[in-house]
Regions:
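Sec/Tat signal peptide C-region and signal peptidase I cleavage site
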Residues: 23-27
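Transmembrane beta-barrel domains of Gram-negative outer membranes and organellar outer membranes
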Residues: 28-271
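Bacterial N-terminal signal peptides
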Residues: 12-22
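Bacterial N-terminal signal peptides that target proteins for export
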Residues: 2-13
């Protein structure tokens, strides 16, 4: 596992040096964009037509819920967003992880998706901005440790209200099915963002899932639950009009002291 950790850190360091080396040449640019990362809920903004955004990072998850004892290191998560039209973007994501358990280590592709986000409504003084997001989860083979065995889908309606010049409230309603469970999860998330300056932003959010079938991995050992209650807090810093860096931290309210997830990331407008 140490080798994977070193490999992931090396990739991130090289990427950071590459991008930070470009900051000076980008200082005079006025181009701006809005990354989706970080956060479990998704914003309503669409990439401008023809523009490509790369959002990447690393993370470490510690999970002892329901008697498990696993540490998962995300070596690399990469989301590519391409502005297809003024109203829609195409989204591609692939994550690579390694997990350490008392029984041994395993790793591989942890997430592979293709999807779209479509602008529905621009919003008004009272009414929120609205967007639709649809995602297809690509299945893995019989030896895949993380990917679903069957094709899965996610559909979300995204909303955003500007409460003031510094505060924004976003909320996310959706359904997610990985192809392996009897029924989909219903998703609800709410995100409050505070932006005190042009460069800094801070957020806290609650994101939750409900399944009509009780899930034993959402509760203490020997128990099960219809609900999975999670929360995340984080911040982002705008290095330049094309480059953001961010960090986040997640907890689980189902078993507060038995789960944590921390990550670092960057978002880069490539063109």
């Amino acid at each position: 596992m140490i080798a994977y950790l070193i490999s992931g850190l090396r990739r991130t360091l090289c990427l950071s040096l590459l991008m930070l080396g470009s900051v000076h040449s980008m200082a005079q640019e006025t181009i701006d964009f809005s990354p989706d990362a970080p956060g479990a809920t998704t914003g309503v903004d669409i990439m401008k037509q023809g523009k490509i955004d790369w959002e990447t990072g690393i993370g470490l998850e510690w999970d002892r819920r329901n008697g498990e004892h696993a540490r998962t290191f995300t070596i690399n998560t990469s989301m590519f967003r391409l502005g297809l039209t003024p109203q829609a973007e195409v989204r591609l994501q692939i994550d690579e992880c390694i997990t350490h358990t008392p029984e041994g280590n395993f790793g591989g592709i942890a997430n592979a998706t293709i999807g779209t986000k479509i602008k529905v409504y621009e919003g008004g003084k009272v009414f929120p901005k609205v967007a639709f997001m649809g995602t297809m989860l690509i299945p893995g083979g019989s030896n895949a440790h993380y990917l679903p065995k069957h094709l899965g889908f996610q559909t979300h309606l995204l909303f955003e209200n500007e409460l003031s010049s510094k505060f924004t409230l976003g909320y996310d309603l959706g359904a997610e099915w990985n192809g392996d469970t009897e029924s989909p999860d219903l998703f609800f998330g709410a995100n409050l963002t505070y932006q005190p300056s042009e460069r800094w932003s801070f957020f806290v959010e609650s994101y939750n899932r409900y399944n009509s079938k009780r899930q034993d991995d959402w509760a203490k050992p020997g128990q099960d639950s219809h609900f999975n209650f999670m929360s995340e807090a984080g911040l982002a810093y705008k290095v330049s009009p094309r480059l953001y860096v961010n960090t986040f931290y997640d907890i689980s309210f189902n078993e507060f002291s038995r789960y944590s997830n921390i990550g670092l990331g960057v978002a880069w407008l490539l063109n």
